[in-house]
């Protein structure tokens, strides 16, 4: 998968500065996953956030317009992902997607979970049998309207 030049520049500068998404999130007052989504062109920064980010990374103002313009969300490669980590999420939805849908609808009714009024957090859970990845999604429930 190839990424836009802006993504490549942001990731390179982040690596050169020895920063993590969590470090940048603290600086901006935002969650690390949201910051990563900004790097990948899936979120929109305010002018102040873009200025602070670009200054921290030592990048020029020419990226500000890209960072502050609302993107076409979900515009990543539409084929089945081949990156093993990303593919696991695809596989999880293949296995658990319908069961999750049914459980959500039993609890809430007919509707969807918002990805707009939404947060996602990734945590490391230490375990003697091998560390675990904990992903928590929290989205507003939006019932389908009848008319």
Curated annotation (Swiss-Prot):
Q: Which residues form the active site?
A: 88, 91, 114
Q: Offer one example of a GO biological process linked to this entry.
A: cyanate metabolic process
Q: Which Enzyme Commission number(s) are listed?
A: 4.2.1.104
- Broad class of enzyme this protein falls into: lyase
Q: Per the record, what are the reactions this protein catalyses?
A: cyanate + hydrogencarbonate + 3 H(+) = NH4(+) + 2 CO2
Identify the keywords attached in UniProt to this record, alphabetized.
Lyase
Record Gene3D superfamilies: Cyanate lyase, C-terminal domain, lambda repressor-like DNA-binding domains
Q: Which GO terms describe its molecular function?
A: cyanate hydratase activity; DNA binding
| Pfam families listed in its UniProt record | Cyanate_lyase
Q: Which SUPFAM superfamilies match?
A: Cyanase C-terminal domain, lambda repressor-like DNA-binding domains
| The keyword Transferase is annotated on this UniProt entry | no
Residue stretches in coiled coil? none
Query: Could you tell me what this protein does?
Result: Catalyzes the reaction of cyanate with bicarbonate to produce ammonia and carbon dioxide.
PANTHER family, per database record = CYANATE HYDRATASE
Q: Which NCBIfam families match?
A: cynS, PRK02866.1
**Entry similarity comment:** Belongs to the cyanase family.
What is the name of the protein in this document?
A: Cyanate hydratase
Task: Give the species.
Answer: Prochlorococcus marinus (strain NATL2A)
Point out the gene that encodes the protein.
cynS
